[in-house]
Amino acid sequence: TLVESYIDDIGLTSVSLKNLGSSLASDYKRRNEFFKENSLQESVKALEYATNNGIKNLSLYTPYDFAFKYASNALEVPYAATQYEVLDYSIPFYQLVVNGLFDYSGEVINAHDEKGNQWHIMHILETGSNVAFTFSYEDSTELIQTDYKYYYYTEYSKWTQDVKEVISTIDEIGIHGCELTNHQLVANNIYKVTYTG
């Protein structure tokens, strides 16, 4: 498999895998059916191979429950359970389940800076998420005519003040190292969360 070739050829000990553990596909072509159960089995086989062959830190993007035991941390876990307007409000169900199993981060802050630091801080506190930024050392305009043009926001030097603000605010409150145990709606768009530890 692709996972095996990367591990064997490159000798990695830490990897971040975008769809493995968080995507199950199927294909119903005649005489070559591939069901979601087959996809699940192949995913588990790849995750087993990775963890049994030198991968000590495995980052997965919002992994499904079958991948929990392989994950060192989860990336880009959505703050809200759904975007459907018909619901009154959303609870961080995923975070309540995985809190204490592995670390997880929410949205990449500089990829969604239109929401503002305060918005991100409030959602980090509400969900127990880690802070997430994506950075490049070089000027990100170098990426404009490449396949990586969507990383236009990554130049580290432009984000140092935001990083300091967000991290110092979260550290001052001291939620990390604690367990998220309760989430309750107090009033419209006002939530009370409980941490223990």
Describe every region a protein language model picked out:
Residues L2-G197:
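Active-site-proximal substrate-binding groove within the catalytic cores of carbohydrate-active enzymes
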